[in-house]
A protein has these predicted regions:
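Internal, well-folded beta-alpha domain core
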Residues: 86-233, 237-242
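Active-site helix-to-loop segments that bind/position phosphate- or nucleotide-bearing substrates
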Residues: 2-89
Length: 242
């Protein structure tokens, strides 16, 4: 069983660095394509300020020169979902579960274990980067499928932009999750609720060593409980009353 989570734009590099792994060929091809952009071109590519574009340019060039600092990916990313994941003071069993089951989907590194070394970078599948004439999704599809072809059970905490990198055959194995708030009988869903809840849900999976859909249904976390009446066999809905 594998649990898939996305990358995040926000990063925290105030961490001890770790040794890098050699880049796989698919990653090197993406890096080579990114490295063709000047800082001013990156400003429009990323739709960021000139200052931010220079920072990203430096990240890319450091990766090219193999001088970039690397950090465990789960600790490097620091978006809302990540800040709600239990990332330290793990028991030995929780650490083993995390290492065996939690994987990050990256547009630069592929599908990798959550504690894999990553360097700071900014890239997702909505960005219009061409790699040898292909979109990022087309470039990664074979490698993404290969990473999961042996899996019978896949828990996806991904947004659709990441899920659609996988073939239909792989997506059909995925169990997805929806997190909603019940405000006086009105069910609400928005990205802030979803991101926080994904992190809290992953924490509950880790703490309870969940291996099956049935075990996931029984979880209660951060005020969320499973709602059978709103769920489908491959989409579990959790609701928090506020």
């Amino acid at each position: 069983m594998k649990i898939l989570i996305p990358t995040a734009k926000e990063m925290n590099t105030d961490l001890p660095s770790i040794e890098a792994n050699p880049l796989r060929p698919e990653s090197q091809a993406v890096l080579d394509a990114l490295a063709l952009y000047s800082a001013s071109q990156l400003e429009s590519f990323y739709k960021v300020s000139a200052e931010k574009a220079v920072e990203e340019f430096q990240h890319i060039q450091a990766l090219k020169r193999q001088t970039a600092q690397h950090y465990p990916a789960l600790n490097l990313f620091d978006g809302l979902m990540y800040r709600h994941i239990k990332r330290d003071k793990l028991t030995e069993a929780e650490q083993v579960y995390l290492e065996n089951h939690v994987f990050i989907t990256s547009a630069l590194y592929g599908v990798v274990p959550a504690l894999s070394p990553m360097a700071p970078h900014r890239l997702d599948f909505l960005m219009k980067l061409k790699v040898a004439g292909k979109t990022l999704k087309s470039h990664w599809k074979t490698a993404y499928d290969e990473a999961l072809k042996q899996e019978e059970m896949i828990f996806s905490l991904l947004s659709s932009e990441f899920e659609t990198v996988f073939s239909k055959e792989i997506r059909e194995k995925m169990v997805t999750f929806k997190f909603m708030e019940d405000r006086g009988g009105q069910l609400k869903i928005h990205s802030t609720i979803s991101k926080k809840a994904r992190g809290a849900f992953l924490t509950a999976l880790i703490e309870n060593q969940v291996q099956t859909v049935e075990e996931a249904r029984r979880l209660s976390f951060a005020g969320f409980n499973y709602r059978e009446d709103l769920s489908q066999p491959q989409e579990l809905v959790f609701v928090k009353e506020v």
